[in-house]
Amino acid sequence: MLKEFREFAMKGNVVDLAVAVIIGAAFGAIVSSMVADVIMPIIGAVTGGLDFSNYFTGLSKTVTATNLADAKKQGAVLAWGNFLTLTLNFLIVAFVLFMVVRFMSKLKRKDEAAPAAPPKPTREEELLTEIRDLLKTKK
């Protein structure tokens, strides 16, 4: 049973999938940092210093806090600013992945665009062709 598991785990698809998951997680962290540390501050500067992740709407009268962390302690809140930030994060990840897939597709098409020259006929095929031609002329 251990041997079967080892054979399964070492198949190309399983190993490729594991590598893809690890790279995907690292890529997600990079994009999250790009959104939180680069894009959102720029958007905040353009909109007058707004930090969308701290926007919320209290769902009860007991919520009087002005920041999200304290408001969550006071009661139920609708953290729509955080949702907006995560949605923007998703859109950026999706766009970057789209660009990567598009680039890879272009490379693949470029490789496919140059078809390989047909292989030269083997000596055996040449002889058979000559024999065929001789038989045709004898008829």
Swiss-Prot record:
The protein's name: Large-conductance mechanosensitive channel
GO cellular component: plasma membrane
Pfam families: MscL (PF01741)
Family affiliation: Belongs to the MscL family.
Topological relation to the membrane, as annotated: Multi-pass membrane protein
Keywords: Cell inner membrane, Cell membrane, Ion channel, Ion transport, Membrane, Transmembrane, Transmembrane helix, Transport
Superkingdom per UniProt: Bacteria
Entry GO MF terms: mechanosensitive monoatomic ion channel activity
InterPro entries: Mechanosensitive_channel_CS, MS_channel, MSC/AndL, MscL_channel
Organism from which the protein derives: Nitrobacter hamburgensis (strain DSM 10229 / NCIMB 13809 / X14)
PROSITE patterns hit by this protein: MSCL
Compartments where found: Cell inner membrane
